[in-house]
């Protein structure tokens, strides 16, 4: 109980004061624990990923995640046909991972592959900047060029303007074709024996009537297949040894938040 002095100043009994101090200490402790817990949770879900020393931005990660999301979903559904759409990403599958953990893993693998393509292209001098930001800059320049041509009444083939997804897909294919057709790349040149062997391993047809052709007529297609296979092998090997630095648990939680 509190009593009033003649001066109007309130005093607190010692017992009550002690109880008040205990409550205050407990309150501060609870707040501190909550803050620390929140800080630890923020640390756990913080986004951080580098590939071969290159920092991956959230924008780049999400862009790649969206790219692989459909195929990942098909893979998960092939394992569990009856899983609902709401539970698809939180269900645990045979590999011991949840759907969103598997999606995070697939996203990182795709990022490794794409960075391998860009690193190879930079090493060959096809591009100057192998980063995601470099790709965005090239896209802006391409879109600006197309816009100016349209304003001048000039012919523009293909799209009037690229989206990020479309431009990245176009550029990855372009860089592959550029490497494959670069005569200075010795790994893209094959002996007659290699060409003949690849031709003999399959049947080759052309046209709607599916007319079978000999090597002289199928030669360009045979060499193209050999080059594509060699390029894929080279790129996948480079991606496989890429150094990845990041907390997969945090990446998985970040991935889940995007779904």
Q: Where does each model-flagged region fall?
A:
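FKBP-type peptidyl-prolyl cis-trans isomerases
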Residues: 19-20, 40-43, 50, 69, ...
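Gram-positive cell-envelope targeting signals
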Residues: 1-64, 100, 104, 222, ...
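Acidic/polar surface patches and capping/hinge elements
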Residues: 160, 181-213, 227-259
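Soluble non-cytosolic domains of exported or imported proteins
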Residues: 98-115, 129-133, 161-170, 186-193, ...
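Buried hydrophobic packing residues in well-ordered domains
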Residues: 53, 121, 175, 198-199, ...
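Glycine- and small hydrophobic-enriched segments that form the cores of compact globular domains
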Residues: 177-179
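N-terminal targeting/tethering segments
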Residues: 40-162
């Amino acid at each position: 109980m509190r009593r009033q002095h003649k001066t109007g100043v309130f005093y607190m009994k010692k017992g009550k004061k002690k109880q008040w101090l205990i409550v205050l200490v407990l309150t501060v402790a609870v707040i501190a624990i909550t803050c620390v817990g929140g800080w630890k949770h923020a640390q756990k879900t913080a986004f951080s990923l580098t590939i071969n020393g290159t920092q991956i931005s959230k924008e780049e990660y999400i862009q790649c995640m969206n790219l692989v999301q459909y195929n990942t979903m098909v893979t998960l559904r092939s394992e569990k046909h009856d899983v609902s759409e709401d539970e698809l990403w939180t269900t645990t599958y045979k590999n011991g991972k949840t759907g969103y953990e598997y999606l995070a893993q697939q996203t990182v693998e795709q990022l490794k592959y794409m960075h391998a393509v860009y690193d190879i292209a930079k090493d060959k001098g096809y591009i100057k900047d192998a980063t995601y930001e470099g790709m965005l800059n090239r896209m802006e320049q391409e879109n600006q060029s197309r816009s100016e041509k349209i304003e001048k009444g000039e012919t523009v083939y293909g799209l009037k303007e690229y989206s990020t997804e479309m431009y990245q897909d176009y550029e990855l294919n372009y860089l592959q074709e550029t490497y494959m057709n670069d005569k200075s790349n010795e790994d893209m040149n094959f002996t007659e024996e290699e060409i003949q062997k690849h031709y003999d391993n399959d049947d080759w047809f052309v046209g709607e009537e599916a007319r079978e052709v000999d090597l002289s007529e199928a030669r360009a297609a045979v060499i193209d297949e050999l080059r594509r296979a060699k390029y894929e092998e080279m790129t996948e090997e480079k991606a496989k040894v890429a150094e990845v630095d990041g907390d997969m648990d945090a990446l998985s939680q970040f991935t889940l938040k995007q779904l």
